[in-house]
């Protein structure tokens, strides 16, 4: 029965409860200057929101399932209901989805957004470092996820950025997710507590010791652990090529590859 549990990508239409964290706390304003709030117009014309994070002055990383027809990124924001003096609102020039992204399995759920102009680095806006290709998170390590998604399965959203502690779990905890792939995904959660990224948090970072190691991808509809994040380390060579403007048509990342 557990294998039949409803799984969902954690993107949410705006107006239906978008952006926040379950079981977490409000972040200190602008203490996570890399956080990005994405306002998306989908291919069908609907409005949706996702999270993301600044990895260079002109590139934001997010989940591939957050791709839309048009996207505007807001940096330096804590309360999305207000126009804060720290905000930088920049339109997306290009969406670069990983060439092996699979909508049905959520594998390779990673995308880079090239901004129309470079962000200005300020105390409220800055980049976050990425891991080395050989880095691999070990079970038991404590990290944090952040976002503006729902605070509960039936609760409304909060306008302010929130964050939650997340424990890296053993791959066995995600064995009931049919398409879970340990080489490219991270299994996270707090086994005895409902602490999770949820609807609207998609694309936000999993931060461990100041480094972005994961991207919010999908989880259970009831918000119980575990949730699945895209593992960033095996994609670092691809990320570097995108940022340098190299041709991506011949690049491929095979599911059988090891990230080390």
Curated annotation (Swiss-Prot):
Residues 1-18 form the signal peptide. InterPro entries: Peptidase_S1_PA (IPR009003), Peptidase_S1_PA_chymotrypsin (IPR043504), Peptidase_S1A (IPR001314), Trypsin_dom (IPR001254), TRYPSIN_HIS (IPR018114), TRYPSIN_SER (IPR033116). Its main location: secreted. It is an enzyme of class 3 (hydrolase). Its EC number is 3.4.21.39. Residues 21-244 form the Peptidase S1 domain. It comes from the Eukaryota. GO terms for biological process: protein maturation; proteolysis. It is found in: Secreted; Cytoplasmic granule. Disulfide bonds join 50-66, 143-208, 174-187. The active site is at 65 (charge relay system), 109 (charge relay system), 202 (charge relay system). Residues 19-20 form a propeptide. Major secreted protease of mast cells with suspected roles in vasoactive peptide generation, extracellular matrix degradation, and regulation of gland secretion. May participate in generating perivascular beta-protein which ultimately aggregates into amyloid-beta deposits. This is Mast cell protease 1. It comes from Rattus norvegicus.
């Amino acid at each position: 029965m557990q294998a039949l549990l409803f799984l969902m990508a954690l993107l949410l239409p705006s107006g239906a409860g978008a952006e926040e964290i379950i079981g977490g706390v409000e972040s200190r304003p602008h203490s996570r200057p890399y956080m990005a709030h994405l306002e998306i117009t989908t291919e069908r014309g609907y409005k949706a929101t996702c999270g993301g994070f600044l990895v260079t002055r002109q590139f934001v990383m997010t989940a591939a399932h957050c791709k839309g027809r048009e996207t505007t990124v807001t940096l330096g924001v804590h309360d999305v209901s207000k126009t804060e003096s720290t905000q930088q609102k920049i339109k997306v020039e290009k969406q670069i989805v990983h060439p092996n992204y699979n909508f049905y399995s959520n594998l390779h759920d990673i995308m880079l957004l090239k901004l129309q102009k470079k962000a200005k680095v300020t105390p409220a806006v800055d980049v976050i470092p990425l891991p080395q290709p050989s880095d691999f998170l070990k079970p038991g390590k404590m990290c944090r996820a952040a976002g503006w998604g729902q605070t509960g399965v039936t609760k409304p959203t909060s306008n302010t950025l929130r964050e939650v502690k997340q424990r890296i779990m053993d791959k066995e905890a995600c064995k009931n997710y049919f398409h879970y792939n340990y080489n490219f995904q991270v299994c996270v959660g707090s086994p005895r507590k409902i602490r999770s990224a949820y609807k609207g948090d998609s694309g936000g970072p999993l931060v461990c010791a100041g480094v972005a190691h994961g991207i919010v991808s999908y989880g259970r509809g009831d918000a119980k652990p575990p949730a699945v994040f895209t593992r960033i380390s095996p994609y670092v060579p691809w990320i570097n090529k995108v940022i340098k403007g190299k041709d991506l048509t011949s690049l491929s990342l095979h599911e059988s590859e090891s990230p080390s």
